[in-house]
Amino acid sequence: MSTAPSLSALRSSKHSGGGGGGGGGGGSGGGSADPAWTSALSGNCSGHGPGSSPAGSTKPFVHAVPPSDPLRQANRLPIKVLKMLTARTGHILHPEYLQPLPSTPVSPIELDAKKSPLALLAQTCSQIGKPDPSPSSKLSSVASNGGGAGGAGNGAGGDKDAKSGPLKLSDIGVEDKSSFKPYSKPGSDKKEPGGGGGGGGGGGGGGGVAAEKSGFRVPSATCQPFTPRTGSPSSSASACSPGGMLPSAGGGPEGKDDKKDPEAGGGGSSKGSGGASADGVPAGLGHGRISCGGGINVDVNQHSEGGPGGKALGSDCGGSSSSSSGSGPSAPTSSSVLGSGLVAPVSPYKPGQTVFPLPPAGMTYPGSLAGAYAGYPPQFLPHGVALDPTKPGSLVGAQLAAAAAGSLGCSKPAGSSPLAGASPPSVMTASLCRDPYCLSYHCASHLAGAAAASASCAHDPAAAAAALKSGYPLVYPTHPLHGVHSSLTAAAAAGATPPSLAGHPLYPYGFMLPNDPLPHICNWVSANGPCDKRFATSEELLSHLRTHTAFPGTDKLLSGYPSSSSLASAAAAAMACHMHIPTSGAPGSPGTLALRSPHHALGLSSRYHPYSKSPLPTPGAPVPVPAATGPYYSPYALYGQRLTTASALGYQ
């Protein structure tokens, strides 16, 4: 039959005897001795019953064309298709596998069939992934098989192993050991009778058993949940493992407990601890990992065994919540921030997610640098703000460290702030700088000699405090090229436009502290380091900048400037703002370019601008960097406001 063309079976008519009738058996006539192609189609044979002819046999249906004919070959169907078309699809949704076994077996033979290993395997496989059936909907065969007390204990106390009757194979629906549930924790199926912590079959071990670790059910499968270490009451409900933060891929020392509970609720954080643990995670926040606004999964509660346990370092990484552990003064920050915004933590190890939400309503501090990237900072920081980096509630503490380091796209040196140890070094190295012209990607050691002292963007809290004093804006960390990422004492906007001009159309994002005697800071950065001279007025600063810009060959290099080929003051200011060409060195030397990134070898001149008619140099000539100066003066005047709002909206 394997070579059957279409549905016609190749039958030799020498098969004597009565036909198989209409069932598709292919009746073959005994009268004719010639080989003929008899049809096995039930429609062809349906009229020829066994008694339909006087000879008692069916007349064979003779095809006019042999099977090798092209017309018949064209009508053939593959055997796989035939099997799919004629197969009974009931085995896919077989009711016996989807519903529990009947409580009373119909016959002993059927009961034996149900107890066969294949049937048990099929039933076990059919229950994979299904939620735990409630005790009422479970099999009632326990009661009929003498396990009535066990069934009652299963419903009342939740003790699934208290089978008092003899365990029979028909208890397979009730006995949880045999139905494989890959999503339930191994320890959570055996609930203590007094427990009832979380719902369903998972999660909440006994309330009195403080040693059982309970995992939070994270609604999304992107990250493994944190499992609170509830052994000591000092650790908060989102306490991380003692090493600091588990990587967002799960694993770590407590990876064995990271199996997800079958509770589907994102809010149900089943506390497995005795009531001493301060549960600082709000109900809408179903995971212990705090996803800060920068997508930086910093578990902010360092589980220090001997120190003041659970002290919440309020490390708001660029504008979301720190989990309040109940003992630190930053307790109000966590309640309303993340419950409405991000559902799942945005992993810093997986790029491509927009991470910055709008500033939440529950922002706690009035001048909160936590919202430095999430929204706009206040115009002036309040006076008397504690700049002590050791207090968790202070502005600069871990917040400024995280906001400064996070906004500048770099991590902090180890041990320099409370954040050290609470986050892996690569957590804050995502490209968090929203400035499209920023070259300091991934903490490139930007300045040739200047940045060596304070490893690229990593800021000390003292430098951050000095930055606040000098009016350093955290929405746009520095001027467009970020020449002074490592020098926080340099001001916000570029050299030509001081940060005090908050309403300046070119730099709308600068803000300053009031009562600063010398608010205008020279931002010029050369290979020798930043200038950082302070001036009282912008005119003095501009005249000082002319000393930086007067170097030989400027007219020649500025010939590509769109407006003028002479060294106008605007061109000088533009070069002062954007190019930071030092006074010494050949025009194309690496020290001159002061480029802040190793993978921008050609610097700004490699960026194509369609409207700049910069003459290309001769092949041996150095790269004419200021030829690209002109095109980079206008975009900030045109798009400065738009870039600012886009950065607040998480535009990358």
Swiss-Prot record:
A zinc finger (C2H2-type) spans 520-548. Keywords: Acetylation, Metal-binding, Methylation, Nucleus, Phosphoprotein, Repressor, Transcription, Transcription regulation, Zinc, Zinc-finger. The lineage of its organism: Eukaryota, Metazoa, Chordata, Craniata, Vertebrata. It comes from the Eukaryota. Residues 1-72, 126-283, 296-338 are annotated as: Disordered. It is found in: Nucleus. Residues 16-32, 145-157, 194-209, 264-283 have a biased composition (Gly residues). May function as a transcriptional repressor. Residues 1-11, 221-230 have a biased composition (Polar residues). InterPro entries: Elbow/Noc_ZnFinger, Tscrpt_rep_NocA-like, Znf_C2H2_type. The modification Omega-N-methylarginine is found at residue 642. Residues 135-144, 231-244, 314-336 have a biased composition (Low complexity). This is Zinc finger protein 503. Residues 254-263 have a biased composition (Basic and acidic residues). The modification Phosphoserine is found at residues 107, 235, 241. Belongs to the Elbow/Noc family. PROSITE patterns: ZINC_FINGER_C2H2_2 (PS50157). It comes from Mus musculus (Mouse). The gene is Znf503.
